[in-house]
């Protein structure tokens, strides 16, 4: 067994109300014992264990907090969308059009490029305090490209999400139902060994609520856990579909109604807010405050 004692902590945030009666559970002048990578003890520095400690780290009065959890990332991609970002900053409309450009770049990228790009982003997240991270597919949109994206992602995190239903790719624009059949059939079967979650972009320019329900239920029938991109571009039924299916989360939720908020408040579904996507649209922050 390996044991590490972090001592001389100015403030330790435990998220255990038993310590100070608040949700943060702050302990002043604290210590933390880690055994085999797992927190084994937390408490006042004066009460810290002293036996069988193989490593001691002096926090020098700094704060120690739980690691950040990033539950929504799109790391499996190639290329960039700087032109789209510029357009959005100039106030031009966005209806998920930039996704198609990234799909083209991702399909043409090697496994090595996808892996190194994702690893670089992952390292950056870890260096900023993230300890648990989710990675989605969704920029391949073919059976092979979605499978290889998730196969690579699974080597980087335990939390992988199948997002074959990101948008309908250009080759299926005239027959979107055929793409839904592909996602719920051969594509789903191909990615099953490499994913835990299934996600759908249920919004304007992406998938209707009926198609989203069909796709999510197909994944759930195979043991995947549901989540959604919902109500990013306009109000719709995505949030309430997430509640209906007991989804782990509905993400973005930039446009929500009172009915959406009421549905969320009585459910187990978490609303994941992504404020970085709203920089060009500051007026939308008001609706986010209602969700909070």
Model-predicted segments: where are they?
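Short loop/helix-cap segments at secondary-structure boundaries that form the rim of catalytic
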Residues: 44-53, 242-244, 263-264
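Non-catalytic positions within long, well-ordered alpha-helices that form the structural scaffold/packing
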Residues: 126, 191, 220, 243-246, ...
């Amino acid at each position: 067994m390996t044991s590490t004692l972090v001592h001389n902590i100015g403030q330790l945030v435990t998220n255990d109300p038993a310590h100070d009666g608040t949700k943060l559970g702050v302990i002043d002048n604290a210590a933390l014992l880690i055994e085999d990578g797992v927190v084994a003890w937390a408490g006042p520095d004066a009460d810290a264990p002293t036996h069988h400690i193989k490593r001691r780290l002096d926090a020098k009065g700094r704060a120690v907090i739980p690691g950040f959890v990033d539950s929504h990332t799109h790391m499996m991609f190639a290329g960039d969308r700087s032109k789209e970002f510029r357009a959005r900053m100039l106030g031009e409309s966005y209806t998920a059009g930039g996704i198609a450009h990234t799909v083209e770049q991702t399909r043409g990228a090697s496994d090595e490029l996808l892996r190194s790009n994702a690893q670089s982003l992952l390292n950056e997240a870890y260096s900023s305090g993230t300890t648990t991270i989710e990675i989605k597919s969704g920029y391949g949109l073919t059976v092979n490209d979605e499978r290889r994206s998730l196969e690579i992602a699974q080597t980087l995190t335990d939390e992988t999400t199948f997002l074959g239903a990101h948008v309908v790719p250009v080759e299926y624009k005239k027959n979107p139902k055929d793409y839904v059949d592909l996602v719920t059939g051969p594509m789903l079967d191909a990615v099953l060994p490499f994913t835990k979650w299934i996600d759908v972009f249920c919004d304007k320019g992406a998938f209707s609520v009926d198609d989203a329900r069909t796709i999510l239920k197909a994944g759930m029938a195979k043991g995947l856990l549901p989540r959604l991109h919902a109500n990013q571009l306009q109000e719709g039924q995505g949030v309430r579909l997430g509640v209906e299916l007991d989804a782990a989360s509905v993400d973005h939720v930039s446009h929500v109604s009172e009915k959406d908020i009421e549905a969320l408040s009585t459910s187990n579904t978490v609303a994941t807010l992504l404020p970085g996507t709203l920089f060009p649209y500051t007026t939308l922050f008001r609706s986010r405050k209602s969700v909070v």
